[in-house]
């Protein structure tokens, strides 16, 4: 029993350290509960989708962090100033998501399906950053 406890103590300490480092790496503006997102409607194949608009750096950093759910007919659209290879990750998310990158003309340049959230200390330490295959200005 003592050897098992001795083996688990360093693992527990490492998990706590990873969790603290992960939380410290979240920019302060994303931790604020009062981040407000403008809302809008976009059309995907003639189907309306209500979206929260992440069009500033603090809004993009915060994204859907700490949100418990997202109704099927809603989403968040990340809007960037110019085309680029904008990567996203699922830090402090509570549910998996599909991600779609669009170019300036609205053409799909990349899709990632069922991306898992990173919410435990071990998941946060190895949270994957998804990079699109093409330049985009919008990510849904």
Region roles according to the model:
Residues 2, 6, 22-140:
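Compact, glycine-rich, soluble single-domain proteins
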Residues 10-23:
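Hydrophobic membrane-insertion alpha-helices, especially the h-region
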């Amino acid at each position: 029993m003592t050897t098992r406890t001795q083996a688990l103590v360093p693992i527990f300490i490492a998990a706590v350290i990873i969790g603290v480092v992960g939380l410290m790496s979240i920019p302060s503006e994303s931790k604020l509960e009062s981040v407000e997102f403008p809302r809008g409607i976009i059309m995907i194949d003639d189907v309306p989708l209500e979206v929260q608009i992440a069009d500033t750096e603090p809004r993009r950093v915060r994204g859907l962090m700490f949100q418990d759910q997202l109704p099927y007919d809603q989403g968040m659209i990340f809007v960037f100033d110019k085309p680029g290879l904008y990567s996203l990750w699922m830090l402090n998310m509570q549910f998996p998501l599909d991600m779609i990158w669009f170019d300036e003309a609205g053409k799909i340049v990349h899709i990632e399906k069922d991306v898992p959230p990173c919410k435990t200390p071990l998941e946060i330490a190895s949270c994957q950053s998804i990079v699109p295959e093409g330049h985009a200005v919008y990510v849904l």
